[in-house]
Structure formats: C-alpha cells, structure tokens
Amino acid sequence: MVLRQLSRQASVKVGKTWTGTKKRAQRIFIFILELLLEFCRGEDSVDGKNKSTTALPAVKDSVKDS
C-alpha cells in the first residue's frame, strides 16, 4: 500500500517535470528559429538598421552590354 502510493507520487512528479522540460525546450527552439530567421532577413544589426541582403552589388547597364 505504501509502496504503491510512493510509486504514484513519483510518477506524478516525473510527469510534471517532463512537461516543464518539454515546454522549456519548445521555447528555446522557437527563440533560436526566430533568431535564425532575423539573421537570414538581415535584421540582426545592433543599431536596428537592416543590413543589405544582396551579396553582390547591382550590375550596371554599361557593364552588361560588354
């Protein structure tokens, strides 16, 4: 009887701990995804200005004709 009660209490405690761990892991995962998305969009600068998203400068018309 006492052993069964202790077993139930332990399983409830583990269940609550696991639920909290899953929620925390989800929040961390979402934070990392949002950070990665901002970085890919170029919104990760310290001054709040967006970075240029183009890797190369635009090609001028005179260069394209050559």
UniProtKB/Swiss-Prot annotation:
Primary localisation category: host cell
GO biological process: monoatomic ion transmembrane transport
In-chain residues carrying the UniProt-annotated modification Phosphothreonine: T21
Any one GO molecular function term: channel activity
Stretches in topological domain Cytoplasmic: 1-27
Post-translational changes noted in the entry: Phosphorylated by host PKC. Phosphorylation alters the stability and may also have an impact on the subcellular location.
Regions crossing the membrane: 28-44
CC per GO annotation: host cell nuclear membrane; host cell plasma membrane; host cell rough endoplasmic reticulum membrane; membrane
Highest taxon of source: Viruses
InterPro entries, sorted: Polyoma_agno
Subcellular compartments: Host cytoplasm; Host nucleus membrane; Host rough endoplasmic reticulum membrane; Host cell membrane
Keywords carried by this UniProt record: Host cell membrane, Host cytoplasm, Host endoplasmic reticulum, Host membrane, Host nucleus, Host-virus interaction, Ion channel, Ion transport, Membrane, Phosphoprotein, Signal-anchor, Transmembrane, Transmembrane helix, Transport, Viral ion channel
Membrane topology, Extracellular segments: 45-66
Membrane listed as a keyword: yes
Keyword Manganese: no
Modified residues (Phosphoserine): S7, S11
Family indicated by similarity: Belongs to the polyomavirus agnoprotein family.
Subunit structure: Homooligomer. Interacts with VP1. Interacts with large T antigen; this interaction may impact upon the activity of T-antigen on the control of viral gene transcription and replication. Interacts with small t antigen. Interacts with host CBX5; this interaction induces the dissociation of CBX5 from LBR, resulting in destabilization of the nuclear envelope.
Function: Alters the structure of the nuclear envelope by interacting with host CBX5 and disrupting CBX5 association with LBR. Involved in the perinuclear-nuclear localization of the capsid protein VP1 during virion assembly and maturation. Plays an important role in the release of progeny virions from infected cells and in viral propagation, probably by acting as a viral ionic channel in the host plasma membrane. Allows influx of extracellular calcium ions in the host cell. May contribute to viral genome transcription and translation of viral late proteins.
Protein name: Agnoprotein
Organism: BK polyomavirus (BKPyV)
